[in-house]
Amino acid sequence: MTTGQQGLTYNAVYGVNLASAMSEYGYTSTVIPSKGSLDNLDKVASGAAQIGFTQADAFQYWRGRHVNEAQKVDIIGELADECVFVAVKKGGKVSDEGDLKAGVKIAVGEPTSGSYASWQYLQGLEKDYAKVETYAKGGVRSLAKVTTGEYDAFLWVSAPDRSNKFLEAVNQEGSGLAMIDMNGWHVDDKLPNGKPVYELKKAVTESGWLSDSKVKVPCTKTLVVANTDAGDDMLETASTVLLKNLSRVLGTNGK
């Protein structure tokens, strides 16, 4: 079972919980860390792993580039929402998503990450995004470079209902950073199962005494995918667990 970076949600929550639930049906699963959604899809398609996790938009991006390999990958379940967030420098070159065009520099995460795939996929849908200078750099260090002006924006993908290291950094007093809406376009692309790749949602970026700060952002689902040759019994069991025991796989504070 190919998951995600050590200690992050795909690895430490979804992978561990799905493996535990499947063990009750007699299946022993090894939960292996990975570099993210695209890495997982490569491993599932090649048979190096039987089950993996991926963002829905990363799956669409990958399918478009691996038409033959995609025949070996089946969606067997879906988990929670993940949303595309963009942080910018207050008073900088980018004040809203309409400023994401030629002459702007954005850091979007490592080349095997879901956030990188999200941006590549969005660039194919929105022509102005395709003109933005893109850097395959992630981590808080890259976010910090937005404050110095080395980058104009930083993109990441995370659950809309829980804090993470990037949001915490943006919300830090005196960070000089701000979040922007990403809702200036309409996307109606569909997954192979007929469901939309993105839905626009309001996500809380900071909780306040009187009101919460929110941004409108495109959200995609976490999909569970499997190799089509993994065996009918095993795939049936995994699908059953995902249907009947979803809250257990998500974990008590599931994303």
Q: What residue ranges belong to the model's regions?
A:
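Bilobed "Venus flytrap"/periplasmic-binding protein-like clamshell domains
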Residues: 1-28, 82-148
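Pocket-flanking alpha-helical
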Residues: 15-16, 32-70, 141-146, 161-170
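Structural recognition of the beta-strand scaffold that forms the well-ordered cores
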Residues: 31, 50-54, 85, 107-108, ...
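Pocket-lining segment of extracytoplasmic ligand-binding domains
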Residues: 56-58, 92, 115-213
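Signal peptide-directed extracytoplasmic domains
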Residues: 57-93
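A structural signal for short loop-to-beta-strand junctions that line the ligand-binding cleft
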Residues: 69-79, 204-216
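Short Pro/Gly-enriched coil loops immediately N-terminal to beta-strands
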Residues: 75-84, 171-174, 183-184, 215-221
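Extracellular/periplasmic juxtamembrane helices and adjacent flexible linkers that interface
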Residues: 221-255
